[in-house]
Amino acid sequence: MTDVSVSKIRNFCIIAHIDHGKSTLADRLLQETGTVQAREMKEQFLDNMELERERGITIKLQAARMNYRAQDGEQYVLNLIDTPGHVDFSYEVSRSLQACEGALLVVDASQGVEAQTLANVYLALENDLEIIPVPNKIDLPGADPERVKREIEEVIGLDCSGAIEASAKSGIGIGEILESIVHLVPPPSDTTGEPLRALIFDSYYDPYRGVIVYFRVIDGTVRKGDRIRLMASGKEYEIDELGVLSPNQVQVEELHAGEVGYIAASIKAVADARVGDTITLARARATEPLPGYVEAKPMVFCGLFPTDSDRYPDLRDALEKLQLSDAALQYEPETSSAMGFGFRCGFLGLLHMEIVQERLEREYNLDLITTAPSVVYQVTTLDGEVLRLDNPSKLPPPQQREKIEEPYVKVEIITPENYVGALMDLCQTRRGIFIDMKYLTQERTTLIYEMPLAEVVTDFFDQMKSRTKGYASMEYSLIGYREGELVRMDILINSEPVDPLATIVHRDKAYYVGKALVEKLKELIPRHQFKIPLQAAIGSRVIASESIPALRKDVLAKCYGGDISRKKKLLQKQAKGKKRMKAIGTVDVPQEAFMAVLKLDREG
């Protein structure tokens, strides 16, 4: 790797909604610049995780360095920093954007601008990036690049006169994209002489070398063997290996301001090298860290329990290993009378939760029971103490608390206009507060609502997709906590409260949710030898109940005729046995029953 002058470096990323062709475009750029040979090429080269390919989404960030000889004959280094497109990973996106000077805005020419594209574009504009619009998939029969350009101009306010119409799949427009990156994206500022400051934009755990940190040098120079300090955690390490990603790792001796690379420094856990942290030298320290570092805070919590309690240590090890590569995942041990030992885990959002569960099941062969997702409530007790609760079963009784506050989010939904009525109805039933409605074009509308996060985390996304035949897209951001009429609803099975089924609900909806839940449990819990009452209760007041009838063994089968008192004796003996069983018998609750809370139709 030869030294490159800063003026020949271009750092850029690709912003796109899921399925608009970002990973395919990245593949084409790697091929066009000769970074990856055709025979090594596989679809979605930068999406390393099997799960990413399967779901067609980018979860962890990747980076690739490409050498490109432009038409002016000069050799340039282009660093592509990949970004996840999904709303749960918006913090990761904001850090990748901080490491760039430019962005390609990829929009599907047949679909138009979507909600998550908008959210990421606003982040890019905040970071003062040069944005190049690229209407993609122009060879599709339904493509209308002119309409998409108009949409970008109207909605985002970007000038689309220099937009490049492309099709990543057929390779149309790839050369023009590379040229425009060279000419439009500004080079990094040359601050090689200043104390080292480098931004960590991703890290992953390698079982042999420890944590591999991906970073962008903002100021100064970093060399192999340097002793570095991470400014947020205050820990120091020695660099064992320094290199660039091309896209496979290639070792180098030093990297200067503006360059992107990776280091291995025997770091034990990803939590020690947090994304967004600043790397500086241990001796010649920078005085100020780079701005914008935020510790990722989990928004959604749920309990994870192994179906076989002997595998609890395996689950603990798996979570420890996952946390090495996913700093946003939090967990703490939890016990439950119904499910034994497990963990209470915190996630960035619903997609993050699903992905972690799938990775645990897939990569570590675990069978898991998950409880209903809940959000973090703020409870003010009568003596003025503020508690943050992520578990409904820990809620203090009503006589000890002054108020409960729940997190609210601002939800932006972009939808074809003929589904507006159905979506407004959905938002209304989810306690949404209507804020605004804008027409992007004649046939597409943005709806803006404020609603409780608890109503969004269950199945709001699925409901939104099914009511709009899959056409709507959404984006949400936290706006703060608000007081609400919230109560804790317990579910009693055979008069015993079952912790994992407890939920915090709004008082107005408690009856509907309780009724739906006990009806669902009645379908899912198998019949036993004794009658099982199912009840939904708020405090000591039962608000909905159902019962599962007993299985009856025919004890009179052996009596052929004969005395009635003989039959009575047998029936009374059976009744006594049932009574004793009911008192001491345990109810076997299947995994599906716990999942029922997730899949409940919450329309009340």
UniProtKB/Swiss-Prot annotation:
Keywords: Cell inner membrane, Cell membrane, GTP-binding, Hydrolase, Membrane, Nucleotide-binding, Protein biosynthesis
Entry GO MF terms: GTP binding; GTPase activity; ribosome binding
PROSITE patterns: G_TR_1, G_TR_2
Residue intervals of the tr-type G domain: 7-189
One GO-annotated biological process of the protein: positive regulation of translation
EC identifiers of the protein: 3.6.5.n1
Record's protein name: Elongation factor 4
Organism encoding this protein: Synechococcus sp. (strain ATCC 27144 / PCC 6301 / SAUG 1402/1) (Anacystis nidulans)
